[in-house]
Amino acid sequence: MLTLDYVQDPSHGWIAADRQMLAFLGLLEVTSTYSYQDQDLIWLEEDCDGPRFLSALSRVGIDYQLVDTHTRGDAWIRNLPRYQP
């Protein structure tokens, strides 16, 4: 089972995905401007990119679980660079 971090602040959330996993799933080209990157860890926004990633995992038979973390203010993820393939 794949364990994925899911960080949420009061107004948004992001799911962590390894760049190699995104490449394996054919998802390096994300559609939103609200996903971020921290070296090879990509933080996919929860409204569009995250669900596409989770659907792709299910499609290829990879089970996953999300580990939720909530912040009171803006999440530190907002300070990362925007994702670029």
Residue map of PLM features:
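Short, extreme N-terminal segment that most often corresponds to the first beta-strand
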Residues: 1-18
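Intrinsically disordered, low-complexity boundary segments flanking structured domains
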Residues: 1-4, 28-31, 66-67
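A short, exposed loop/beta-hairpin motif centered on an aromatic-Gly-Thr core
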Residues: 37-46
